[in-house]
UniProtKB/Swiss-Prot annotation:
PANTHER family: UPF0337 PROTEIN YJBJ. This is UPF0337 protein spr1626. Belongs to the UPF0337 (CsbD) family. Residues 1-30 are annotated as: Disordered. InterPro entries: CsbD, UPF0337_stress_rsp, YjbJ_sf. It holds the Pfam family CsbD. Gene3D superfamilies: YjbJ.
Length: 67
């Protein structure tokens, strides 16, 4: 989980909320898009970490280092 992506999600939420509050539809949509992009990046990072962990586990099993 990336702290940077969590911060970007929060920034997007704030931007979306401000846009909604002041009636700026463009700002609202930009904020919503930033939130989604950051969430996708976070999920991709988590998946990458999981795959790397699984690969490392398989390597250890094959080399006998899993003990």
């Amino acid at each position: 989980m990336s702290v940077e992506e969590k911060l970007n999600q929060a920034k997007g939420s704030i931007k979306e909320g401000v846009g909604k509050a002041i009636g700026d539809e463009k700002m609202e949509k930009e904020g919503a898009a930033e939130k989604v992009v950051s969430k996708v990046k976070e999920v991709a990072e988590d998946a990458k970490d999981a795959v790397e962990g699984a690969v490392e586990g398989v390597k250890n099993m094959l080399s006998g280092d899993d003990k």
